[in-house]
Amino acid sequence: MAQQVSARQPRYKRILLKLSGEALMGSEEFGIDPKVLDRMALEIGQLVGIGVQVGLVIGGGNLFRGAALSAAGMDRVTGDHMGMLATVMNGLAMRDALERSNIPALVMSAISMVGVTDHYDRRKAMRHLNGGEVVIFSAGTGNPFFTTDSAACLRAIEIDADVVLKATKVDGVYTADPFKDPNAEKFERLTYDEVLDRKLGVMDLTAICLCRDQNMPLRVFNMNKPGALLNIVVGGAEGTLIEEG
């Protein structure tokens, strides 16, 4: 059973949570920190416990970074395919952590991997979400040259999610990198066009344009802040909200 946590009514019925692969590293320099997996599983379980349907996309940067190898001469398509496989590995690890917490979960891959994951099917994904399972979308869009941010926005639109929640290391979008610039100011709210015009680097151009064209709200928040994810889902004002003006 998913953990029962709050009597507050959720603001969102269905969300798409985007985690970076680097987030799974925790304090490690590479790979997956089991403690981080367990903490994330607990926070996701809190959402399931109040009836929120959760779709999940995880990057692969903790296991493989194709851009560096591409710059060194590796074929870009080959590198992107390797990156897709890294996201599948992260998805399997997250499914295991969720199931150990008695939270039902399903991994779907945009690349067919019979016997390892289910192949991505929109209608099947929505049936499992309606049944209370966490659905983990892996292997990006299945196409090279598309980021996992683009995959997250695409899947959110396909499954008719209410919002995309992008978990980062900082509590929102700033005028500059707050780790490098102490005078950086945080935005409470932005429009898609402001993100594009200011070149804020929240997500890649394709992802932002997808959200803008389909009017999909996007909230950027700090996943390392305890309770932030639950607070957003019940209507709290964590991070930065990006939506149509």
UniProtKB/Swiss-Prot annotation:
Enzyme class: transferase
EC number: 2.7.4.22
SUPFAM superfamilies on file: Carbamate kinase-like (SSF53633)
Pathway in which the depicted protein is active: Pyrimidine metabolism; CTP biosynthesis via de novo pathway; UDP from UMP (UMPK route): step 1/1
Presence of the UniProt keyword S-adenosyl-L-methionine in the record: no
Lineage: superkingdom: Bacteria
UniProt activity-regulation remark: Inhibited by UTP.
GO function terms (MF aspect): ATP binding; UMP kinase activity
Reactions it catalyzes: UMP + ATP = UDP + ADP
Keywords: ATP-binding, Cytoplasm, Kinase, Nucleotide-binding, Pyrimidine biosynthesis, Transferase
Any GO CC annotation of this UniProt entry: cytosol
GO biological process: 'de novo' CTP biosynthetic process; UDP biosynthetic process
Major subcellular location class: cytoplasm
Positions contributing to ATP binding: K18, L19, S20, G21, G61, R65, T168, Y174, D177
Residues the entry annotates as binding UMP: G60, D80, T141, G142, N143, P144, F145, F146, T147, T148
UniProt subunit comment: Homohexamer.
HAMAP family, sorted: PyrH_B
Name the record gives this protein: Uridylate kinase
Gene: pyrH
